[in-house]
């Protein structure tokens, strides 16, 4: 109990500046979270473009790279926030993959809204849980707090997007794959078909890939059951065998190749949801790094290949870019005649360079 109380008290001091002025509850917490984001951006702790983040004294570092495919504007985007919520032991990472005519606007809106909203909800739920447990012997679960925070955040972001005056998300949407590292635990929240893969040392002392997320495709049994139960349809087109898509009951639209996403309100009544799957994992010294990538990478690169590409990159800042470059080569070789997808990668390194075989140089890709 003492650990969580001190955690809350430290965060509460940061939020209290806004609450001294008035007592508007959630609106104040949201404003404070937005101010934290602005301050972090000034201190170069938030990265939204291709580059590298490594705060002084932090065990975390992250490499980002995004490349436009051959289908038009790049609808992928990413974000890393080191020192998330002014907490030295926290980092937030995310990959957001848009689709549809307004997909690039949707993905950027989700990217920009989610971190502050998540921080606000985490603060409020943590505060309430701390108050509820005062004087009791119940064990406070950090996972339950993060899960509730993510569920509330995703519902809020999707609702805001539906009523956005400048973004038409009726036939457009975005996936979202995010990770929060807090000390020696990571919390993963997945909406869609981007994927997180962990590189860890096996009992045989080799570096192996462990997939941390499910690709939420419409033909997964639990996903298809929900869609069919809501009168939606799931089938492949004749010229795309093996590519299962979600369709409205009486029309050949929209043909969405994932079962969870923000936006896409044309089929929200027919089984598509924006509910995240939230999981946790305790980090050990055997865990080296985590790769977050949009589906364009995984269409042509296996989990193990991705781990080997990143681990063999001498400089951490170049890791994400090198993985994308290898995927571009694989697209040209394996998927000739098919327009290359947008591809984005975040490589989150879990230990300082002094305890890793990968060298580290702070640099930014232009």
Residues of each region from the PLM?
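PP2C/PPM-type serine/threonine phosphatase catalytic core
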Residues: 2-366
């Amino acid at each position: 109990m003492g650990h969580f109380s001190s955690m809350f008290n430290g965060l509460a001091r940061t939020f209290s500046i806004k609450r001294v002025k008035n007592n508007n509850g959630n609106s104040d917490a949201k404003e404070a979270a937005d101010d934290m984001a602005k301050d972090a951006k000034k201190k170069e702790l938030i990265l939204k473009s291709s580059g590298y983040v490594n705060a002084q004294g932090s065990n975390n570092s992250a490499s980002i790279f995004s490349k436009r495919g051959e289908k038009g504007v790049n609808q992928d985007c990413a974000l890393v926030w080191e020192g998330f919520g002014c907490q030295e032991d926290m980092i937030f990472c995310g990959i957001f993959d848009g689709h549809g005519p307004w997909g690039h606007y949707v993905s950027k809106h989700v990217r920009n809204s989610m971190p502050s909203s998540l921080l606000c909800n985490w603060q409020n739920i943590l505060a309430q849980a701390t108050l509820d447990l005062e004087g009791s012997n119940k064990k406070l679960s950090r996972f339950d707090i993060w899960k509730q925070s993510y569920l509330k955040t995703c519902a809020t972001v999707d609702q805001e997007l539906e009523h956005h005056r400048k973004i038409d998300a009726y036939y457009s949407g975005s996936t979202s794959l995010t990770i929060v590292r807090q000390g020696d635990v990571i919390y993963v929240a997945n909406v869609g078909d981007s994927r997180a893969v962990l590189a860890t040392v096996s009992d045989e002392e080799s570096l192996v890939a462990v997939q941390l997320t499910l690709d939420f495709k419409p033909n997964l049994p639990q996903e298809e059951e929900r869609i069919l139960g809501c009168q939606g349809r799931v089938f492949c087109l004749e010229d795309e065998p093996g590519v299962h898509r979600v369709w409205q009951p009486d029309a050949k639209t929209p043909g969405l190749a994932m079962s969870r996403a923000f936006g896409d309100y044309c089929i929200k009544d027919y089984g598509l949801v924006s509910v995240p799957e939230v999981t946790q994992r305790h980090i050990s010294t055997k865990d080296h790094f985590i790769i977050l990538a949009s589906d364009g990478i995984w269409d042509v690169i296996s989990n193990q290949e991705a781990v080997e590409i990143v681990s063999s990159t001498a400089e951490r800042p170049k890791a994400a870019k090198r993985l994308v470059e290898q995927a571009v080569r694989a697209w040209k070789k394996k998927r000739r005649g098919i327009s290359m997808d947008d591809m984005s990668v975040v490589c989150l390194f879990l230990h300082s360079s002094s305890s890793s075989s990968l060298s580290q140089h702070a640099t930014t890709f232009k």
